[in-house]
Each structure stands twice: as structure tokens, then as C-alpha cells.
Amino acid sequence: MGTWILFACLVGAAFAMPLPPHPGHPGYINFSYENSHSQAINVDRIALVLTPLKWYQSMIRPPYSSYGYEPMGGWLHHQIIPVVSQQHPLTHTLQSHHHIPVVPAQQPRVRQQALMPVPGQQSMTPTQHHQPNLPLPAQQPFQPQPVQPQPHQPMQPQPPVQPMQPLLPQPPLPPMFPLRPLPPILPDLHLEAWPATDKTKQEEVD
């Protein structure tokens, strides 16, 4: 029983020790997520203890990419993490960029089309589509694009348009922390000579 415990400790120590750096080596031993490594441990126990560096190189080199250290393993880092962290936020950002800024800017356009003449609508279509955050007073005289509001007609009756209109014409606010003049710099003062210490003061210090 003691020999099996000693053998298990040796196997664990072989994987726990950091390996010397060499080209193509990531510098970190991680095989807990790989099924092939656990099978190879059972098959090649003796070879693993005798030559851990060579066995590790032959087993680890294919899953790791050439650019270095990956703490969670190659397959876990490249497949699972992008699905969770990148695709869902992209769908939210696409919805926020396309629906929220564009639709409030389209409501005043629909109201103005009945009042203003139509000739300049098609010329300003690209600039209004790509820059939806322009102030509304600049958009009103140009009469942009009658075509785009049709796909978003269910989205048009939104209440956030009314609070946005009074906020845009406000003048820029003064800075929250105004710069104050710095105090005058003190001129360099000459150092006074130290008074000569007599023997009584030296004795007190000692």
C-alpha cells in the first residue's frame, strides 16, 4: 500500500514540477481537461516516470497553439469561451446600435414629411444612416430618407423620443472642476550653516 502511495506521489510530482523552457513549450502543465492524457497516464506509467519531458512534449504539443500559454487548454479556450462571451454581447450591441439610436431619430422625420417638400431626401440618406447621433435641429431642415422608416414602423411609437428633444439644444456645461491658479512657487532659500556643536551637546546625543 505504501509503495502505491509513493508511486502516486512521484507521478504527481512529475507533473507538478515546472519544466525548463525550450522552443515550442508553453511553460505550463495542464492536462486535467483532456481525456487522451488520462488514458495515456494509465498506459505509459513507467515511461511517464522515466521520461516525463519527452512524454509531455509528444502529448501536449499538438493541442497547444504556437503563440504560447493557454491556462484552460486549447479546445476549451477556442470553442466554449467565444460562444459564451462574444456572440451574445454582439447580438445585444447590434440591437442597441440599430434600434435604439435610429428609431428616435426617425420619428421627427416621419412627422416632417407631410409638412416639408420632398426634393432633398435621397441625397442625405447615407450620412443620416451612419450618423444617427447628430442633433435633431440639424436633421430637421434636410428631410432625410423616406424609405427607412417602413421596416421599423412597429418600433416607432416609443416614448423615449420626447425626453431626448429638450436635452439636445442645451449649451455645453462648464467644467465640473475649474482650473484654479497655482500658488506662487517659493524661491530657493539658501541653507543656513549648522551651528557648531560644543561638547555638552555631543554628550547628550551620545
UniProtKB/Swiss-Prot annotation:
Record field: compositional bias (Low complexity): 128-142
Region (Disordered) residue spans: 118-180
GO biological process: enamel mineralization
Ranges of biased composition (kind: Pro residues): 143-180
The entry's keywords: Biomineralization, Extracellular matrix, Repeat, Secreted, Signal
Keyword Signal carried by entry: yes
Localization terms from the record: Secreted, Extracellular space, Extracellular matrix
Molecular function GO terms recorded: structural constituent of tooth enamel
GO CC term, one of those recorded: collagen-containing extracellular matrix
InterPro entries (UniProt xref): Amelogenin (IPR004116)
Pfam families: Amelogenin
Segment forming the signal sequence: 1-16
Its job: Plays a role in biomineralization. Seems to regulate the formation of crystallites during the secretory stage of tooth enamel development. Thought to play a major role in the structural organization and mineralization of developing enamel.
Family classification: Belongs to the amelogenin family.
Protein name: Amelogenin, Y isoform
Native source organism of the sequence: Homo sapiens (Human)
Gene that specifies this protein: AMELY
